[in-house]
Design a protein with these regions (language model features):
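Conserved glycine-rich cofactor-binding loop
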Residues: 11-12
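The beta1-alpha1 cofactor-binding region of Rossmann-like NAD(H)/NADP(H)-dependent oxidoreductases
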Residues: 53-63, 94
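Substrate-binding pocket helix/loop in short-chain dehydrogenase/reductase
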Residues: 88-89, 93-98
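Active-site loop immediately N-terminal to the catalytic Tyr-X3-Lys motif
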Residues: 90, 137-144
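Active-site helix of classical SDR
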Residues: 112, 148
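Residue(s) in the substrate-gating loop at a strand-loop-helix junction
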Residues: 132
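C-terminal beta-strand-loop-alpha-helix "lid" module of Rossmann-like NAD(P)-dependent dehydrogenases
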Residues: 162-209
Length: 266
């Protein structure tokens, strides 16, 4: 029997690349996104079903998961939906904060929880959650985004303990920079005039990263995490992410933070 993967945030970038990769390798793919009309290529791909799903809508999550499980035995859940909130924390509105946490953190928890009875009954399955290098290191003007990604890493690591006893694996994949339109399509900026000069310095620092990976390269790491059968909990994807995480460990946190401060804030 063929295997099935359920993907959130599959309209573009990594989610789309993962959907196409798994489909090309013979899997049945349930690709979900807020607006299915935005992904005609996926809708026309053999083995891919496209469904509408907003991970901030608990009722819709329950309905979609119930619909999918009536047809498919889901083997892998890929939590990919998310976006970046960047800029001065002081400039973030309550709606900014709520939306970031609701999408990046609560959306993952809701989708995962909806699938757990199915995976537990089967005593098998893998949950792969896309976090970020920003779940292991920090940069200026990304505080709330970091809160969600560090939160996901801690949540998943704890969850992996309890699910392992039930035959279910819980894993994270932490990509570095990806050559997609994330900065345009999936980035919201906060503003506050007191921080304008510092924000400009920081943005210039981000522009120096030339080691970003393609979405296809990161999707290969997702494939590895989903199919290698290992109990490994954390996966890091991309040369830049691996370098930064190793550098933080090698330098120690105080020296690493000093380096980041000098690079981005002068």
């Amino acid at each position: 029997m063929g295997k099935t993967i359920f993907i959130t945030g599959a309209s573009s970038g990594l989610g789309k690349a993962a959907a196409l990769l798994f489909a090309a390798r013979g899997w049945t793919v349930v690709a979900t996104m807020r607006n299915p009309d935005s992904a005609p290529e996926l809708a026309g791909t053999q083995g891919v079903s496209v469904l509408a799903l907003d991970v901030t809508d608990p009722a819709q999550i329950r309905q979609v998961v119930e619909k999918v499980l009536a047809i498919h035995r889901v083997d892998v859940v890929l939590n990919n939906a998310g976006y970046g909130l960047a800029g001065p924390f002081e400039g973030a509105t309550d709606d900014d904060l709520r939306r970031q946490i609701d999408t990046n953190l609560m959306g993952v928890l809701r989708v995962t929880q909806a699938f757990l009875p199915h995976l537990r009954q089967n005593r098998s399955g893998t949950i792969v959650t896309i976090t970020s290098v920003g779940g292991h290191v920090t940069f200026p003007f990304n505080s709330v985004y970091h809160a969600t990604k560090w939160g996901l890493e801690g949540w998943n690591e704890s969850l992996a303990f309890e699910l392992a006893e039930l035959g279910i694996r819980a894993k994270t994949v932490a990509p570095g920079g990806i050559l997609t339109d994330f900065a345009g399509r999936s980035l919201t900026l906060t503003k506050h005039p007191a921080y304008d000069a510092l924000v400009q310095k920081t943005m210039a620092g981000f522009g120096k990263n030339s080691n970003r990976s393609t979405a296809d390269q990161i999707a290969e790491v997702v494939w590895q995490a989903a199919t290698d059968g290992k109990d490994q909990v954390h996966y890091v994807a991309g040369k830049d992410a691996k370098f930064l995480i190793r550098l933080r460990k090698w330098l120690g946190v105080p020296r690493f933070l000093g380096m980041i401060r000098r690079r981005f804030l002068g």
